[in-house]
Curated annotation (Swiss-Prot):
Residues 96-115 bind DNA. Transcriptional coactivator that stimulates GCN4-dependent transcriptional activity by bridging the DNA-binding region of GCN4 and TBP (SPT15), thereby recruiting TBP to GCN4-bound promoters. Involved in induction of the ribosome quality control (RQC) pathway; a pathway that degrades nascent peptide chains during problematic translation. Required to prevent stalled ribosomes from frameshifting. It comes from Candida glabrata (strain ATCC 2001 / BCRC 20586 / JCM 3761 / NBRC 0622 / NRRL Y-65 / CBS 138) (Yeast). Residues 1-31 are annotated as: Disordered. Residues 85-139 form the HTH cro/C1-type domain. The keyword Mitochondrion does not apply. GO terms for biological process: GCN2-mediated signaling; maintenance of translational fidelity; rescue of stalled ribosome. The gene is MBF1. SMART domains: HTH_XRE. One of its GO terms (molecular function) is DNA binding. It holds the Pfam family MBF1. This is Multiprotein-bridging factor 1. GO terms for cellular component: cytoplasm; extracellular region; nucleus. Belongs to the MBF1 family.
Length: 151
């Protein structure tokens, strides 16, 4: 058990005048069990080291989905997006493996996107857009990707 997982306070709740046993923190399961046998365990609390961590928004979304009563199918990729990916890829004389290597994904991911089986991932779609040079999101699917905006 790591130091950050939990700490147990052993001793009296209030020490008036410094008398009585000192409250201390048990670090091992053996120390906790020994204190429980003596009846000295006051609390077992979790310690969380959250100084540099961020909450996961995906976990919040999954909790919301879990609490809903109706069953919702995950969104699938539109069929014309898959056809556009396949068409542009063949125009550029790239195989699925070449495209997958270019965007650092597995060839099965490209296959799923082209077949329309994939659950849309904005990061993967963005990488495909840049690699193929066409839009795959929004209303203008299949149109050439514009360069950076002029200032």
């Amino acid at each position: 058990m790591s130091d950050w997982e939990s700490h147990t306070v052993i001793g009296q709740k209030a020490r008036a005048g410094g008398s009585g046993p000192r409250a201390n923190v048990a670090r091992t399961q053996g120390q906790i069990n020994a204190a429980r046998r003596q009846g000295l365990v006051l609390s077992v609390d979790k310690k969380y080291g959250t100084a540099n961590t961020k909450g996961d928004a995906e976990g919040q979304r999954l909790t919301k989905v879990d609490r809903e009563t109706d069953i919702v199918k995950p969104k699938k990729l539109d069929a014309n997006v898959g056809k556009t990916i396949a068409r542009v890829r063949t125009e550029k004389k790239m195989s699925q493996k070449d495209l997958a290597t270019k965007i650092n994904e597995k060839p099965t991911v490209i296959n799923d996107y082209e077949a329309g089986r994939a659950i849309p991932n904005q990061q993967v779609l963005g990488k495909m857009e840049r690699a193929l040079g066409v839009k795959l999101r929004g209303k203008a699917i299949g149109e050439p990707l514009g360069g950076p905006k002029k200032k």
